[in-house]
Every structure is written in C-alpha cells, then in structure tokens.
Amino acid sequence: MNIDPVALKIGLLEIRWYSLAYIIGILFAYWYVQKIDKYKVFTPESYKSIISWWVTGMILGGRIGYILFYNLNFYMSFPIEMFKLWKGGMSFHGASLGLFCTMYIFCKKYKIKFLSAIDLCLCAVPVGIFLGRIANFINGELYGKVTNTRFGMIFQNSGDFFYRHPSQLYEAFFEGLLLFVVMNLLFFFTKVKSYQGMLFTIFMIWYGIVRFFIEFVREPDVQVGYILFNWITMGQLLSFIMVILGICILRLSRMSHNI
C-alpha cells in the first residue's frame, strides 16, 4: 500500500492528510457540540474561543506526551526537534491529558460545569479519532504485525513485503466509529447524561480496553519496543492506566451522582 501523504499541494504549500484529519475533526466537533448542547452547557461567549483552547490542548499535550512517553532520549539529544511538528510525533494519551487540562481552565474561566462539558465534547471526539487513524493508514504508519489472515496488507514503510494487520483501520472502527455510535446512543436514549462525568468514564474505559487489545496486533514503536514482560507496549500501559482511572471515577460518580 502506497498512498501519497500529501492531500493537496499548491506551490510550496503542502496540505497533508494528517493535517486535514485534525482540521476536519475539530470543525466537526465545534459544529456537533453546539448542535447537541440543548441544555446550554456552554455559554455563547465561550463558543467564540473554544476552538483555540482545543487546539492548544491537543498540540501541547500530544507533542509533550510523545516526547515523554515515546522518544525522550532523542529529543534530549536534539531539543530543537521538539518544535518540528511537521515531522510528526503526537501521542493520543498526551493529547487527551492536554485537552483535559485546558478544558478545566476553560471551564473555570467561563464558569461552566467541567464534567458536563467534557461529557458533551466526548460525544464528538470519536469522529476525530476515526479521521486520525484513517490518516495514519494513508501515511502507512502505525501498521500492524505480520499476519496470514485475509485482512493482511503490505505497508511499504515497514521495510519488508510481509502481509500485516491494518491495525489503523481496526482502531478507526472500534475507537472511532463504534465508540461514536455508543456515546451518542447513551447520550440521546438513556439517562446517563444526567450524571456528570459518566460519559467521560465510559469513554475512558472503552477506549482503554480497545486500544489495549488492538496493540497486540500492532507493531510496537521501533524506538520503544516492549517496556514490560516483553509483550506490554507503552500504549498498552497508558491505556491500562486510563481504564483504571475510568473505573475509579465511575465508582465515585455512582456514589455521589454528581462529581
């Protein structure tokens, strides 16, 4: 499989699929959150600046997370490389933490209920995850392990001609499309949204479990490899922590019904 990672080129300007995924995902979230915000969780004034807060949280968190979790030694040796975002290197877990922090500050600033805001936003986030994984697939990165199944594909970036799991597509479906359906079914057809933070915990647990198991068929990052027992990757460790935190918050939420 070999698809040009550049979606559009105008003179010296190159627009990559990965950049388009971010842009479309953010614009969709902005539109969708306003559409489903029937109880006016966000104020009209807050909507004017929310995109800048999202972008700041995702970029800072995603980049810092990647540096700390996946390639710290390299960036300590070549610190200027930290700022070369166009070369890639973002972490979902880092971006999630960055968004969590910026949204907390944002909600304090505009006097918005934090967990209600997070619940609302997470109804749209899976679409961004879906688009991001499709971009990973187009770029031929984050491919899976060698397989003999009929789902196998050849990724030129792997440096060999073995058939491999298209793990990006597995993630696009289970972490993206299916999670979007689940989150919105719960939001529209159950009383879950009445309990602040409940959708947040469901998102954390779902994503963490799915990511943990898909990592078994995904090739580990070459610069990190396995970090525990020769079969646990960094992505699995972070996802496991995500699940544990989600379960803990869920228990607190059920006890208090209002975090």
Curated annotation (Swiss-Prot):
Keyword Cell inner membrane part of the UniProt annotation: yes
Family, as annotated: Belongs to the Lgt family.
PANTHER family in alphabetical order: PHOSPHATIDYLGLYCEROL--PROLIPOPROTEIN DIACYLGLYCERYL TRANSFERASE, PROLIPOPROTEIN DIACYLGLYCERYL TRANSFERASE
Function: Catalyzes the transfer of the diacylglyceryl group from phosphatidylglycerol to the sulfhydryl group of the N-terminal cysteine of a prolipoprotein, the first step in the formation of mature lipoproteins.
Subcellular localization: Cell inner membrane
Pfam families the UniProt entry points to: LGT
Record carries keyword Cell inner membrane: yes
Entry keywords, A to Z: Cell inner membrane, Cell membrane, Membrane, Transferase, Transmembrane, Transmembrane helix
Binding site for a 1,2-diacyl-sn-glycero-3-phospho-(1'-sn-glycerol): 133
Gene Ontology biological process terms, A to Z: lipoprotein biosynthetic process
Pathway annotation from the record: Protein modification; lipoprotein biosynthesis (diacylglyceryl transfer)
TM region positions: 10-30, 50-70, 86-106, 112-132, 169-189, 197-217, 227-247
Superkingdom of source: Bacteria
Provenance organism: Ehrlichia ruminantium (strain Gardel)
InterPro entries, A to Z: Lgt (IPR001640)
GO molecular function: phosphatidylglycerol-prolipoprotein diacylglyceryl transferase activity
Identification of the protein by name: Phosphatidylglycerol--prolipoprotein diacylglyceryl transferase
